[in-house]
Curated annotation (Swiss-Prot):
The gene is hutH. The lineage of its organism: Archaea, Methanobacteriati, Methanobacteriota, Stenosarchaea group, Halobacteria. This is Probable histidine ammonia-lyase. GO terms for molecular function: ammonia-lyase activity; histidine ammonia-lyase activity. InterPro entries: Aromatic_Lyase, Fumarase/histidase_N, HutH, L-Aspartase-like, Phe/His_NH3-lyase_AS. SUPFAM superfamilies: L-aspartase-like. Keywords: Cytoplasm, Histidine metabolism, Lyase. It comes from Halobacterium salinarum (strain ATCC 700922 / JCM 11081 / NRC-1) (Halobacterium halobium). Contains an active site 4-methylidene-imidazol-5-one (MIO), which is formed autocatalytically by cyclization and dehydration of residues Ala-Ser-Gly. It comes from the Archaea.
Length: 525
């Protein structure tokens, strides 16, 4: 795909832009205004260094050793030592997309101009992204305060020519990787090591990518639910605008509108409009209310991620002297202030909420799948488990087992990360565990996509039991056709794992919503 470049200015990075850089190798550049802000910030550090006052992380030790003064001759060594000592992560390595998300989100935070670094540091980060030099970063070790220290330290080691990096699929020492990309290692100066490793960027980067994916899953779930509505001979009367105008939650109204648009022109729905059924089961009738609540939860997370992507989250922060109170360290012209912007609680709580919401999305999707398959509840025109010659054949019985298993997993992933740990000699006595929350959310997205894919697979099979002369809605027909590109109708028992994987991948890649958008000549919200 052709991907436009992303301009880093510290103010306008979006989840979509993170996705473009992380997954599609969009090139990055630094805005002129950001460069000026960084230069001004570095000049303030130089001004502070000219005095005798203790300034945290500039001429002192770190954490519980912040009372230790560091001689001027040792300040560069202090920064390099910080990066080395904090590179103590464990566990599986971050995938390339997560590493690139880590790089671009840290770059954008530093570009705001409150971290006291030199432009040179920004330029090397840009070089790593544009030349495809990807630090090897273990996934575990962050407490979500002081930010994501260990992962960011592993990232930062590569800037100073240490550690390992992957280049074009080949692993090599960082010094060799930098040389291959015509990049020079950075000799860190005062404040720069601390600025690099202290922030929420692992949490934010992983959350941004997973949020993009989650919104795709939600739009695909609306599509799957619309197809199930048709195949089960249900009604879209419960999606009438009047119902949602008198309970005006934003997400609910959007999901109801989606169902109406997806099924517009459906001859299947028109065919049984005058039947005797008064109302449908909750899993179909309450789709707008449940999917809408999930949409609101994701919007809640999106607001936090959008803010965090463009925030200064390291500590201390560097300001003009007249912007802070008299107790701040520094001079009349510059102030270096300790704060807590590295604390990931705002993300941890919303990530847990969003993961819980995805568990509910998957749960209601699995219940609709049951109504397609279950001989006790399905409509008379459908065969048990959607199997031709049921009894001899089991049809799609077992894909529902897998969906139910994943729903059970999702319920545990939706638990909030509330455990605390006190570290660094009790100086850092409350942490957020936000990185763990981000990983849980990412896993929840992956599993929910499979559950929604199972519903789409079953909905497409259910279509085979309808009168072929009755057209589906324009949107649901497009989804059916897309499923049939990767999965043939089940005419007799066969292994369905590959079909499930293929349809799940359609959901993850956004291909379901793309097909629907083409058919409706408008994207789903």
């Amino acid at each position: 795909m052709t991907t436009e470049g992303v301009v880093i200015d510290g103010e306008s990075l979006t989840p979509a832009a993170v996705d473009a850089v992380a997954r599609h190798d969009a090139p990055v550049s630094i805005a002129a205004g950001a460069r000026e802000a960084v230069r001004e910030s570095r000049a303030r550090i130089a001004d502070v260094l000219g005095g005798d006052e203790a300034v945290y992380g500039v001429n002192t030790g770190f954490g519980s050793m912040s009372d230790t003064r560091i001689d001027a001759a040792d300040r560069e060594a202090l920064q390099a030592n910080l990066v080395r000592s904090h590179a103590a992560g464990a566990g599986s390595e971050l995938d390339t997309a997560a590493v690139r998300a880590l790089l671009v989100t840290r770059l954008n935070a530093l570009a705001k101009g409150y971290s006291g670094i030199r432009e040179r540091v920004l330029d090397v980060l840009v070089g790593l992204l544009n030349e495809g030099v990807h630090p090897v970063v273990p996934s575990r070790g962050s407490l979500g305060a002081s930010g994501d220290l260990a992962p960011l330290a592993h990232m930062s080691r590569v800037l100073i020519g240490e550690g390992q990096a992957d280049v074009a699929g080949e692993r090599m020492p960082a010094a060799e990787a930098l040389a291959a990309a015509d990049l020079e290692p950075v000799t860190l100066q005062a404040k720069e090591g601390l600025a690099l490793i202290n922030g929420t960027q692992l949490t934010t980067g992983v959350a941004a990518l997973a949020l993009v994916d989650a919104e795709r899953v939600l739009r695909s779930a609306d599509t799957a639910g619309a197809l199930t509505t048709e195949v089960t001979m249900s009604t879209t009367a419960s999606c009438a605008p009047a119902i949602h105008e008198v309970r005006p939650h934003d997400g609910q109204a959007v999901s109801a509108r989606h169902i109406r648009n997806l099924t517009a022109g459906s001859e299947v729905l028109d065919h049984h409009r005058d039947c005797d059924r008064v109302q449908d089961a909750y899993s179909i009738r309450c789709l707008p209310q449940v999917h809408g609540a999930v949409r609101d939860a994701l919007d809640h997370l999106r607001a936090a991620v959008a803010t965090e992507l463009n925030s200064a989250t390291d500590n201390p922060l560097v300001f003009a002297g007249d912007r802070v109170g008299p107790r701040a360290s520094g001079t009349d012209r510059a102030a270096v202030v300790s704060g807590g912007n590295f604390h990931g609680e705002v993300l941890a709580l919303r990530l847990g909420y969003a993961a819980s919401a995805l568990a509910e999305l998957a749960a209601i999707s699995e219940r609709r799948t049951d109504r397609l398959l279950n001989p006790e509840t399905q409509e008379p025109h459908l065969e048990p488990f959607l199997a031709p010659d049921s009894g001899l054949h089991s049809g799609l019985m077992i894909p529902q087992y897998t969906a139910a298993s994943l729903v059970n997993d999702l319920r545990s992933l939706g638990q909030p990360t509330l455990d605390n740990a006190s570290v660094s000699g009790a100086q850092e006595d409350h942490v957020s565990m936000s990185a763990g929350a981000a990983y849980n959310f990412r896993e929840a997205v992956e599993k929910a996509a499979t559950v929604v894919g199972v519903e789409l697979l079953c909905g497409a099979q259910g279509r085979e039991f309808l009168d072929p002369d009755l057209a589906l809605g324009a949107g649901t027909a497009a989804a059916y056709d897309l499923v049939r590109e990767v999965s043939e109708p089940v005419a007799g028992d066969r292994a369905l794992a590959d079909d499930m994987a293929a349809v799940g991948d359609l959901v993850r890649a956004g291909l379901v919503e793309d097909a629907v958008a083409r058919a409706l000549d408008a994207p789903l919200a």
